[in-house]
Each structure stands twice: as C-alpha cells, then as structure tokens.
Amino acid sequence: MQNEAGETVDVYIPRKCSASGRIIGARDYAAVQLNIADVDEKTGRVTGGFKTYAVSGFIRAMGESDDCLHRICTRDGICAGEQPQS
C-alpha cells in the first residue's frame, strides 16, 4: 500500500509477545499491550517516557500473564525483589 507521497507503507505491523517471543496475530483479540510509565524516583512524577509490553492471548489463557510481567519488569529494572510466594 502507498501513502499520498508515494512511499510504500505497511497496513499491519505485527507485534511480538514480550513474554514468549511469539508473533501476536491480527485476530488475537485476547492479547493486551501495556505501557508502563517511567517515574522519577525522587519526586514520584511521571517523566514522559514509558516502556511497552505486549502479552499474547495464549499466555493470558494459561493464567501466566502476571508472572511473566513481573519477570520482565524485574529484568528491566522496573520492579525490585523476588517474585511473591503464592
């Protein structure tokens, strides 16, 4: 597909699951995308930046989305500490 300037553009850009690395298809209506804001540690205010995470419907259906998000956020330095014991 082309825009008004004649440049070729994609209509659909597939997302990748942050937890499993799977491609999230266009028809995966159970998939979610989360934007987690960057917060200044001293003032507690949002700095304007954010990190985006996508979780596929497959991970959500297994009930593993909370563990996966905690693992990813700990890896990226957003969360600190060990995973909570259930």
UniProtKB/Swiss-Prot annotation:
Lineage: superkingdom: Eukaryota
GO cellular component: cytosol; ribonucleoprotein complex; ribosome; rough endoplasmic reticulum
Signal peptide coordinates: none
Major localisation: cytoplasm
InterPro entries xref list: Ribosomal_eS21 (IPR001931), Ribosomal_eS21_CS (IPR018279), Ribosomal_eS21_sf (IPR038579)
A Pfam family matched in the record: Ribosomal_S21e
Assigned keywords, A-Z: Cytoplasm, Endoplasmic reticulum, Ribonucleoprotein, Ribosomal protein
Subcellular location: Cytoplasm, Cytosol; Cytoplasm; Rough endoplasmic reticulum
Family of this protein: Belongs to the eukaryotic ribosomal protein eS21 family.
Subunit description: Component of the 40S small ribosomal subunit.
Protein name: Small ribosomal subunit protein eS21
Gene: RPS21
